């Protein structure tokens, strides 16, 4: 996924009220939209280098959007709205090898009245649901983690993926790791024990789990390589 314009470098002052971030660009402090309502645990230290996009649409109240934060020499993509675009680009361009060379890809497909999954992929007459989770947490130097806060919605998705397997679908949960410099991924069971337990149940039931790391720079973010999931 390419940015429409090259990003602008700045320094993070603070994030507040979930949706706002003050950023210093040169000698000016601007307020940017923060497109990530999660905890952003470990990313928000004052002085962290950031990259923002700029939109000159006069109808927009905030011209800048926070896109990338640099933490411990690692670039981290924080715009959750881009996760599905990055995943779609990966699916279309056969970057996710487990579902490469597919016949069709549909986005936002309902499984039942209450739940829709990010993608329905068809390959060799097999229907495959793919649910995407954006990953930005890394507390250990080389290991990405999910979730960064308790996620009841995430647990619900795991349970529904189990139901999809029971009905004959193949199911994948793709952890999209928007963090450079990590080699492994694991479930943060100390943050959300229930999610970890549901992960184990889903794995046992036949849900497939994948972790793919992204390549990140000020011009684009795209899926780069598969990394190892190290949970039991």
From Swiss-Prot:
Short name of any one Pfam family annotated for the protein: SfsA_N
GO molecular function: DNA binding
Signal peptide from the UniProt entry: none
UniProt record similarity statement: Belongs to the SfsA family.
Protein name as annotated: Sugar fermentation stimulation protein homolog
Encoding gene, per UniProt annotation: sfsA
């Amino acid at each position: 996924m390419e940015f429409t314009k090259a990003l602008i470098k700045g320094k993070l002052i603070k994030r507040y009220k979930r949706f706002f971030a003050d950023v210093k660009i040169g000698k000016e402090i601007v307020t940017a939209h923060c497109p990530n309502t999660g905890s952003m645990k470990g990313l928000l230290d004052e002085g962290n280098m950031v990259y923002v996009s700029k939109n000159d649409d006069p109808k927009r109240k905030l011209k800048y959007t926070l896109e990338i934060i640099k933490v411990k020499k690692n670039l981290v993509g924080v715009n959750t709205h881009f996760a599905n675009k990055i995943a779609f680009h990966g699916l279309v361009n056969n970057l996710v090898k487990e579902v490469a060379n597919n016949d069709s890809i549909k986005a936002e497909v309902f499984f039942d009245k209450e739940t829709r999954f990010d993608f329905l992929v068809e390959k060799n007459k097999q229907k495959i649901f793919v649910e995407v989770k954006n990953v930005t947490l890394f507390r250990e130097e080389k290991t990405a983690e999910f979730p960064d806060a308790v996620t009841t919605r995430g647990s619900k998705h795991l349970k529904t993926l189990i139901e999809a397997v029971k009905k004959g679908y193949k199911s994948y949960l793709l952890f999209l790791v928007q963090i450079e410099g990590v080699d492994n991924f694991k479930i943060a069971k100390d943050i959300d024990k229930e999610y970890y337990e549901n992960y184990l149940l889903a794995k046992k039931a036949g849900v497939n789990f994948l972790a793919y790391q992204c390549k990140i720079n000020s011009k684009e973010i795209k899926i780069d390589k598969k990394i190892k999931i190290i949970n039991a």
